[in-house]
Structures are given as C-alpha cells and as structure tokens.
C-alpha cells in the first residue's frame, strides 16, 4: 500500500472546524531561559471514515493518507526505526510503501469511537497522560456538546497510569486498549488533536479545563517539598540539608499515593518546591497564587512544561539552577534521555533567597 505521509497542520485546518485558534503568550520563568514567548497550534477534532488504526500508533484514511502528526507525534528516528521496532515500512518519506496487517476487529457505529494514541515510552508518564490524552475529552465535549463519557475511547496501547486515573476519577468511562502490532477498522473514527506541541506549548483553556473538571477547591495552606529519593535520576543529593532548613514544610513522596490524594495535596499547597520531574504535573491542581520553585540544571533550562502550566493557572513559578551531579553507569529504565541521567545539588542559601523573594 502506498500512502501519503501527512505532517502539515494545514491539512487539518482545511478539512475540520478549528476549536482553539493559535494563541501567543510569554512566560518569564528564568532570566537565562532560551525562549520565553510561545504560540499554540490550532486544535480540532478530525473525523475519518472507513479508516484503519494501527497500535504503533497511526491512522490510514480512506484516501491512503497516513496520519500521525498533530494527533500523536511519531518519532520514527528515535522510537520507531524500521525493521527494529516494526515491519510496517522500510523508509520514511513523504510518500511511502507500508505493509499494514489485516484488521483484527471492525467497528461501524458512527459518532461513537474516539482515537487516543500514545506510545509505550510515554504511556505511564503523568504529564503526557493528562496533557496529551485526557485533555482530548475537552475537545470532544466542545465539538459535539455531549459529555465525554458518552463516547467509547480507543487507546493505541496499555497505560497503567491512565487505568489508575480512570478507576478513581471516571470509572464509568468505556475504553478499549489495542494489543501491540494490531490493526482495527472503523467506519467512523473521531480523532481529537493534541493541545500541546514542542513538548510544553499548551493551550491555556485546556489547562484550565483540566483543573476545573478534576481539581478540588481547598484551603491552600500547606508548604510541600516533593522528594524524589525513590527516583532513578534528578534526585536532590542534599535534600536532607534543604529540608532541615525548611521550617514548617512537609516532605512528600508521591510514589504509592492515589490520584485523588495527589489532587487534594496540591490543591491544599500554598508553596511547592521540587526538582524537575513528572510529579509536577500535579501543578494542574494548585490554586491561583500558589508559589512554585522548580529545581533544575542549565542543560534543562529549555524545559518549559511546568512554568507554562503555572502561567495558565496564575501560579508564581520560578526555576532555580543547581549543580549537575553525574551518576556513574548506564542510563536506567525510566529515564528517557542520557542528559537527564544525573542528580542535582542546590545551594541552600540561594534557594531560601528565592523563596523569600516570591
């Protein structure tokens, strides 16, 4: 089968109604940040008839268009190298020959099935699940004026984190999970776009919708220090020294904590201090005015994901740079990039100066 590889956002703009138009904002989270002004992509809900969905994930339309970009980016150079991770194609190009396995299942009912693609590398990352998967419920509600639970969702692969969130927050949600390397056929498939691009340029209304839909209204009075002592990397090696100096603060470990517990914890936080990590996705639940200090390092100063969330929700967010402490040995499972495989040390005096200045 010869398919046209679709990557331009104009393809979707010409075919489907736009829900969120592009929006520009500025986030001044650190004086040395390489970029501070960002522009969002338009959002939409695509509709495909007589199409095939593959668990890689990708969609092949009835016009033989291959859809990955703007629904879930297919990073073929790093994650999906032909003949190593799949046998669908041998060479990536604008027009390419693919070998799609026969459809294992077929679904014909219109306006019922919603495509939720995600790759196995991101499937249990809290930030990706909230920002790139669950956020798509909002586009479905805005497009069709129905509750998101009126539809059936199709996840391109398993996600234990999504399962946990579903059990606690929306147990009535109906969804299927595609087995690896399988193809399903749909008479009509709804495909919401991402509300995030370039790893953190998020649509403001999406972030606000998540807090409104799943957050709690609490008395924000707790000062919390998020421990990453059980994480494989980005641990604060002088965390004990820092905490001893943080009079009246709580040290919290998120591992093993339920989803509702985490939402309640961050809803009650007036101050949050943490090294950069997926646990900061919980900033979604903080009340406006919450003060956030994110401990990072120079090599990661382009990571704007959490400062942008804070900007949209009216939080006061600052990034402080610590000293990188290399970890000996090979990168371990759970760390995506080699540059992320290190720990951090922070000057206590600099941290307190920043806290007192907020």
Name each model feature, range by range.
Residues 1-358:
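The feature primarily captures lumenal catalytic ectodomains
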């Amino acid at each position: 089968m010869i398919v046209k590889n679709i990557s331009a956002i104009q393809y979707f703009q010409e075919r489907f109604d736009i829900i969120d138009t592009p929006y520009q904002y500025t986030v001044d989270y650190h004086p040395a940040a390489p970029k501070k002004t960002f522009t969002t992509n338009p959002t939409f809900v695509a509709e495909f008839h007589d199409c095939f969905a593959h668990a890689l994930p990708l969609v092949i339309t009835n016009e033989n268009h291959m859809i990955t970009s703007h629904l879930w980016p297919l990073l073929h150079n790093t994650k999906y190298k032909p003949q190593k991770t799949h046998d669908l194609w041998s060479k990536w190009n604008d027009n390419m020959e693919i070998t799609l396995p026969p459809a294992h299942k077929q679904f014909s009912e219109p306006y019922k099935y919603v495509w939720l693609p995600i790759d196995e590398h991101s499937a249990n990352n809290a930030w990706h699940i909230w920002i790139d998967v669950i956020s798509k419920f909002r586009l479905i509600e805005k497009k069709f004026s129905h509750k998101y639970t009126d539809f059936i969702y199709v996840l391109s692969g398993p996600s234990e984190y999504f399962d946990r969130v579903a059990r606690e927050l929306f147990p009535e949600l109906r969804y299927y999970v595609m087995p690896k390397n399988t193809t399903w056929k749909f008479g009509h498939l709804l495909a919401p776009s991402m509300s995030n691009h370039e790893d953190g340029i998020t649509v403001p209304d999406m972030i606000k919708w998540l807090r409104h839909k799943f957050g709690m209204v609490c008395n924000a009075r707790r000062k919390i220090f998020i421990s990453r002592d059980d994480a494989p990397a980005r641990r604060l090696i002088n965390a004990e020294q820092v905490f001893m100096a943080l009079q009246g603060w709580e040290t919290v470990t998120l591992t093993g904590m339920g989803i509702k517990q985490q939402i309640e914890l961050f809803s009650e936080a007036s101050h949050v201090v943490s090294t950069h990590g997926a646990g900061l996705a919980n900033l979604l639940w903080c009340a406006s005015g919450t003060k956030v200090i994110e401990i990072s390092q120079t090599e990661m100063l382009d990571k704007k994901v959490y400062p942008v969330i804070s900007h949209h929700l009216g939080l006061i967010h600052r990034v402080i740079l610590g000293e990188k402490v290399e970890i000996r040995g090979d990168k371990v499972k759970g760390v995506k990039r080699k540059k992320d495989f290190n720990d951090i040390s922070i000057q206590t005096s600099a941290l307190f100066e920043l806290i007192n200045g907020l």
